[in-house]
Design a protein with these regions (language model features):
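Terminal, contiguous helix-loop blocks that mediate binding/assembly
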Residues: 18-283
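Low-complexity, highly charged intrinsically disordered N-terminal segments
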Residues: 1-25
């Protein structure tokens, strides 16, 4: 069976409304949803569910075939890795999603496919917002969680080799789904993984990374998405886009009370598996 989760979301970071951000020891929690008991998406406060709690609850019930997050910022490598044992596929966007969300009447046939349902769901979501003249656009992808253990081992080696380049990352040219320094401190930068790898790897290494990523990620993009932060569309350079975001520790996050994203990141399962002791930003 599959699980569809629609609401607001903050990706892998703690809720902006919770006390977890004030206590780094509790900052391992990632959050989804805003539940204030009202049947509306026009809310800015309420209870949120942590991604690790979500994974535990699903595992208790035997897991599911797919999870569709009809919510912003939920396709990150940190989230997919947290859910790797709870679902076979994560379908989501690394960016802001269109306000109307998915058109479930047209997506249901894809959800009930016996095979290739994840690819079909990505295509169905994409088809809703890819027509010429559509004001919203979309970046949507699926992650095959069965491939994540080998991909994380591969990424661990890359991070170890290129740690110095990662910590000196030039952020301005990157495909960024949330611009921390321009849009506010409620979220860190959400860099597209492919954009980051393209900057730090040589041509041969990048070609190999693309091969490895293709075993994990399937992408569809209209070439742009509408951002409520800038009230305009943001164009996507598809050579920079795989449709999955990643966090990179940076000194810009240091000393930001309530927004200690480097410390929060250290407590994610992805950081434990891939970044080891190198997850602290260089000063």
């Amino acid at each position: 069976y599959g699980l569809v989760m629609w609401s607001h979301a903050s990706g892998w970071i703690p809720s902006m409304f919770s006390g977890d951000r004030k206590d780094v020891n509790e900052s391992k929690k990632r959050s989804f949803g805003l539940d204030n008991g009202k049947n509306t998406s026009a809310v800015s406060s309420g209870n949120q569910m942590n991604i690790d709690d979500m994974a535990d609850a699903l595992l208790e019930q035997g897991g599911c075939d797919f999870m569709l997050f009809d919510a912003c910022f939920m396709q990150s490598i940190e989230i997919a890795y947290e859910l790797r044992n709870a679902t076979k596929h994560v379908i989501a966007s690394p960016a802001e999603i269109p306000g109307p969300g998915a058109q479930y009447a047209t997506m249901l046939p894809a959800m009930f496919k016996r095979d290739a349902y994840a690819d079909e769901m990505v295509a169905a979501y994409y088809n809703q917002y890819s027509q010429a003249g559509n004001p919203y656009g979309i970046v949507v992808s699926s992650v095959n969680t069965a491939a994540l253990p080998s991909f994380s081992a591969y990424m661990k080696n890359l991070v170890a080799i290129h740690a110095e380049k990662l910590f000196a990352l030039e952020s301005r040219p990157l495909l960024n789904y949330y611009r921390y320094e321009e849009w506010g401190k409620n979220n860190p930068d959400y860099f597209d993984m492919q954009s980051v790898m393209r900057q730090i790897l040589n041509n041969e290494e990048f070609a190999e990374w693309m091969q490895e990523a293709s075993k994990v990620i399937k992408l569809k993009t209209a070439g742009y998405w509408y951002s409520n932060h800038v009230k305009d569309v943001i164009r996507v350079d598809e050579s920079q886009c795989c449709g999955v975001s990643m966090f990179v520790p940076r000194s810009v996050y240091d000393g930001q009370t309530g927004h200690e994203y480097n410390e929060m990141f250290i407590n994610t399962s992805w950081a434990h598996s891939v970044w080891a002791d190198g997850s602290n930003s260089q000063k």
